Amino acid sequence: MPDFKIVISDPQSVEPKRIKVKAKANDQIKSIAGEKEGKAVPQAKVNEKTKQLLNIDTLITLEITKQEGDKKVKVKSHFKVEVDNNVPDNEVWISKTMAEKFGAEDFEAIAYRTKTLQISIDQDKATNLVGLKIGDTFEANQLIGLPVKLKITGGSDNSGFPMRFDVTGAAKRKILLSGPPGFYPNEDGERRRKTIRGNTISQEIVQINTIIVR
């Protein structure tokens, strides 16, 4: 059975400021089970000045570009931020496990406020979301360890059929659509009959899209 995916977007992170930082593995930052595989949000520490400079609320992204053969590849990870004023300016402390993902324990990276991230959770944990509808909110702390409230904006089932906010229930239905989600017309006024899911999360839903609400 595939993992259940939660896509989280921060609507206040439109054009985040990007700065060059030094990222370091630090023994104070404990690894969290699943963080390297995207099943948990890893922790990072910055000082208050760096947090304010980047206008960070809860999440920070670190990004590097490295050479792999004849290609340049971007590597990035998202972290839950904790303030620690023992961390020098323009420096980010992370766990050794996450440093391995970047290929070094001490490296330069671009840091910015996270715009979007995806977390995978086991299907048994996802049962807590069954019955919720598009537009509903839930606390993410117990589910994925993030101290934020999330609002459901959409999702898709195990066949890739999207949820529709304007169709009540959880069943799969074939309806006439004039726009997204589920259909993107090539011409004005074009309509097409498409298969979609209703607005309610069921056992068949494998991904939901959410935004942070404050």
Curated annotation (Swiss-Prot):
Pfam families: Ribosomal_S6e. SMART domains: Ribosomal_S6e. One of its GO terms (molecular function) is structural constituent of ribosome. GO terms for cellular component: ribonucleoprotein complex; ribosome. InterPro entries: Ribosomal_eS6, Ribosomal_eS6_arc, Ribosomal_eS6_CS. GO terms for biological process: translation. The keyword Ribosomal protein applies. Keywords: Ribonucleoprotein, Ribosomal protein. Transmembrane segments: none annotated. Belongs to the eukaryotic ribosomal protein eS6 family. HAMAP family: Ribosomal_eS6. This is Small ribosomal subunit protein eS6. It comes from Saccharolobus islandicus (strain M.14.25 / Kamchatka #1) (Sulfolobus islandicus).
